[in-house]
Amino acid sequence: MLRLDLQFFSTKKGQGSSKNGRDSESKRLGSKRADGQFVSGGSILYRQRGTKIYPGENVGRGGDDTLFSKIDGVVKFERYGRNRKKVSVYPVAKEA
């Protein structure tokens, strides 16, 4: 008598093999301080990629284009030319 060894292979993938389910962690870019807000020196004002907003008075630009305050003062977001923006920090007048 002839014996046949038949094997059936699955035609569907098993459960749990989703190709979705990955996403990069958010970089938390954008404004960190509001217009008119008091900041101390070294405070981060704006996190960005590239120069969406330019540094103005008393504001420095880090290696990753982060804008930070160089002095204690009040934040001011301003227009710079036709289609540019800048952020400046102005010292607060001391009361006598």
Curated annotation (Swiss-Prot):
GO terms for cellular component: cytosolic large ribosomal subunit. One of its GO terms (biological process) is translation. The N-terminus is cleaved by ribosomal processing cysteine protease Prp. Residues 20-35 have a biased composition (Basic and acidic residues). PROSITE patterns: RIBOSOMAL_L27. Keywords: Ribonucleoprotein, Ribosomal protein. Residues 1-36 are annotated as: Disordered. GO terms for molecular function: structural constituent of ribosome. SUPFAM superfamilies: Ribosomal L27 protein-like. Residues 1-9 form a propeptide. It comes from the Bacteria. InterPro entries: Ribosomal_bL27, Ribosomal_bL27_CS. Residues 8-19 have a biased composition (Polar residues). Belongs to the bacterial ribosomal protein bL27 family. This is Large ribosomal subunit protein bL27. It comes from Oceanobacillus iheyensis (strain DSM 14371 / CIP 107618 / JCM 11309 / KCTC 3954 / HTE831). The gene is rpmA.
